[in-house]
Amino acid sequence: MQNIPELAEIPGAVREEIATFLDQRREQVAEIGAPVTKAVSFLESFVLDGGKRVRPTYAWAGYLAAGRGEEDPTAMLRAAASLEFIQACALIHDDIIDASNTRRGNPTVHRGVEKLHRESEYLGDPEFFGTSVAILVGDLALVYAEDMFQDSGLSAAALHRARSPWRGMRTEVIGGQLLDISLEAAGSESVELANSVNRYKTAAYTIERPLHLGAAIAGASEELIAAFRGYGHDIGIAYQLRDDQLGVFGDPAVTGKPAGDDLREGKRTELLALALQRADESDPHAAATLRKLVGHTSDPQELSRLAQIIADSGAPEEIERRIDSLTQSGLQHLHAAKVDPTVTETLEQLAIKATARRK
């Protein structure tokens, strides 16, 4: 690679690397059998046709900010692109866990496979088949992430430096998901535990670890890595808090997900925990309604009622203040890093985009 891609060019460059990787796997997949080829086509569509490439972009930013070291930019781009397969695994499995029907405005993988089963008039239960295939497709995505990362062309020294963030990121996102569903099962109302989910399921995995990974590959100092991790922690949690707001109040035409999806699924978010605390003090009847219906209704009118109770509690305004505070704190960590002004400006823009988004 003669030209070093700018951060704005990374999403397109990542897509090209993923397409090349999948092309290189076609023969092996075809040898196994036509059903596998068809299953992999769902993964291919998922990773190529959607997504903002947030994680590869942050990994590339960490690499540039640390001065790139002696690593081949092409190898670094492949390593960054591999993060999209981890994201695919996480989302495909997350959609199964949440029984979601849509993702990015399209059918989720398990629903798409379920439709294939019906149209092909296969034997057995279509829903069970769709879930089973989607689990395996998600597993394959995780395998592909490891293959693409290890075969990226990075030096042995760079792979060694990357070992801690690479391992930590995968453990943290799975641990965060486990914590998430455990809180739902327990009906948790803890703000602190909801924040732990935000920390591990989103912040570390979406921003903090990708930045850490890119910087480590380039041989960054411990001081720079610490500054990046501080930025990633704060902006990542703010990103998830914004997601929680959209999960209750977002426009389906913009988000690509049904209105009130988090309420239907019973997500134990910081927004819900705060709303319950405030409603307990100001309107116990409303608090009782929240406890009774969250996670137990799909009725649009009841979901709208729950959203109104949360809005009336004042919790959304408190979440907005927290988003603003975390964004400012994250930017302070970034400015303390004193890296290339162009990279700093881009990371500032990414922070604002992540925390002020509407989808």
Task: Briefly describe each language-model feature range.
Residues 64-66, 92-122, 146, 173-191, ...:
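Acidic, Mg2+-coordinating active-site segments of isoprenoid diphosphate-utilizing enzymes
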Residues 149-164, 287-292:
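Transmembrane helix-loop-helix
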Residues 121, 125-154:
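A glycine/threonine-rich phosphate-anchoring loop and its flanking beta-alpha core
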Residues 1-83, 88, 92, 97-127, ...:
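Conserved N-terminal diphosphate/IPP-binding helix and adjacent helical/loop segment
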Residues 161-175:
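Conserved ATP-utilizing enzyme core subdomain
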Residues 130-136, 192-202:
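A short glycine-threonine-serine/GTX helix/turn-capping micro-motif
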Residues 71-86, 131, 159-165, 224-235, ...:
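Alpha-helical scaffolds flanking conserved acidic
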